[in-house]
From Swiss-Prot:
Name of the featured protein: ATP synthase subunit delta
Intrachain disulfide bonds: none
Task performed by this protein: F(1)F(0) ATP synthase produces ATP from ADP in the presence of a proton or sodium gradient. F-type ATPases consist of two structural domains, F(1) containing the extramembraneous catalytic core and F(0) containing the membrane proton channel, linked together by a central stalk and a peripheral stalk. During catalysis, ATP synthesis in the catalytic domain of F(1) is coupled via a rotary mechanism of the central stalk subunits to proton translocation. This protein is part of the stalk that links CF(0) to CF(1). It either transmits conformational changes from CF(0) to CF(1) or is implicated in proton conduction.
GO molecular function: proton-transporting ATP synthase activity, rotational mechanism
A Pfam family that the UniProt record links to this protein: OSCP
Amino acid sequence: MSELTTIARPYAKAVFDFAVEQSEKDKSAVEKWTNMLEFLSELIRHDKVQSYLTSTSSTFKLADTVILICGEQLDQYGQNLVRLMAENKRLAVLPAVFNEFKSYVEEYKSLSQVEVVSAQQLNDVQQQKIITAMEKRLARKVILNCRIDSSLIAGAIIRTNDFVIDGSCRGQINRLANELRL
């Protein structure tokens, strides 16, 4: 586990718990927090903002500047989060907070991100078969993220948090090579 994740997790958990609590009154609260954190994460990743974070020593000035840039993207609670994280000199951790927050939301909504790396573009039927199989195996709704890696030669690699299924030709060749070395 990286240091950023260790620092980000308590912030993400607190924001998530607050968003769930808010969702009793406002059904879109979790979605609003997702949007706010995503916006903050993208803002903090920007090169000019990164250099500003390291050059500014006043936490109040830093927080006020970030809040000013965000404008209507942040509600009062989002602004409070920015102030708190600026005070603790943790604004640079916001992208990791967003990633951790997304993990909590996925767990809450019984979602799993599944990455499929294939040698060629998968058509809709192939993608649907993978989604169906993974939903059955994981017993939860699946969000498929596909990308192409021609070095696989053929087949695909399917990854989720818990496991990897390597059905690629490259993987089979590597396993065969390892067996032959014995």
